[in-house]
Amino acid sequence: MCSENKNIKLNKSLKGNRVDLIPFKEEFITEKYLDWLSDIEVTKYLDVSNYDQTIDTITNYINRFNNSENYIFAIVIKEINNHIGNITLQNINWVHKFATEGIMIGDKKYWKDGYGTEARSLLLEFAFNDLKLNRIVSSAFVDNLAGIKSNTK
């Protein structure tokens, strides 16, 4: 009934050409991270946009996320070892073998540089090859042109 792959919990990074996806740890929860979550431009299309975030609320969220069957990765630029955002694989349905993905590039100076595209490719490779999922769902608000463009790649 459930995939034998549902118990895979990744402790290693997914390696790309320019970015690595690193399983999210508390060390990524910094003041810089909180600044992203306080930036209306960054959170406009995210569920967190209406909440005041603190180190404690984010730590609790990450701990709940990491103790579930969901995956959250920090997107880190390899060359400079810089955390620029996160990508998730969640709401995994093992019976029908699909999941939802979400991405946030929090550091706006890295928007439109292809880092999100590479991160998504790494996540999809992991989802399809390692977890043996068949479908990944991604959505975008009608006025989120960057999200729509990203979803059509």
Model-derived features with residue positions:
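An amphipathic alpha-helix signature
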Residues: E26-L34, S38, I55, T59
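Short helix-loop boundary/capping segments at the starts of domains
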Residues: D39-V42, N67
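Conserved GNAT-fold acetyl-CoA-binding loop/helix
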Residues: E41-Y61
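A short helix-loop-beta-strand connector motif used in the catalytic cores of GNAT acetyltransferases and
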Residues: I62-A74
